[in-house]
């Protein structure tokens, strides 16, 4: 229990190889993750801004004839 088995060493070596093996591997992985998160946030902004624009356009129009007449009088 005190010493690590061979499978533990394989996992540790795999993590070390991922972190330090090759120039810029970790930074490219993190950069790709950041790009994915940014694209997701931009997609949410686009979706919510188009919904807000649709709601503003709909609310700007009078809903009934009485509201239309009130707007004409003022």
Curated annotation (Swiss-Prot):
Residues 64-74 have a biased composition (Basic and acidic residues). The chain crosses the membrane at residues 1-21. It comes from the Bacteria. GO terms for biological process: protein transport by the Tat complex. It is a single-pass membrane protein. InterPro entries: TatA/B/E, TatA/E. Pfam families: TatA_B_E (PF02416). Its main location: membrane. Residues 51-74 are annotated as: Disordered. It is found in: Cell inner membrane. One of its GO terms (molecular function) is protein transmembrane transporter activity. One of its GO terms (cellular component) is TAT protein transport complex. NCBIfam families: PRK00720.1 (NF001940), tatAE (TIGR01411). The Tat system comprises two distinct complexes: a TatABC complex, containing multiple copies of TatA, TatB and TatC subunits, and a separate TatA complex, containing only TatA subunits. Substrates initially bind to the TatABC complex, which probably triggers association of the separate TatA complex to form the active translocon. Belongs to the TatA/E family. Part of the twin-arginine translocation (Tat) system that transports large folded proteins containing a characteristic twin-arginine motif in their signal peptide across membranes. TatA could form the protein-conducting channel of the Tat system. This is Sec-independent protein translocase protein TatA. It comes from Caulobacter vibrioides (strain NA1000 / CB15N) (Caulobacter crescentus). The lineage of its organism: Bacteria, Pseudomonadati, Pseudomonadota, Alphaproteobacteria, Caulobacterales.
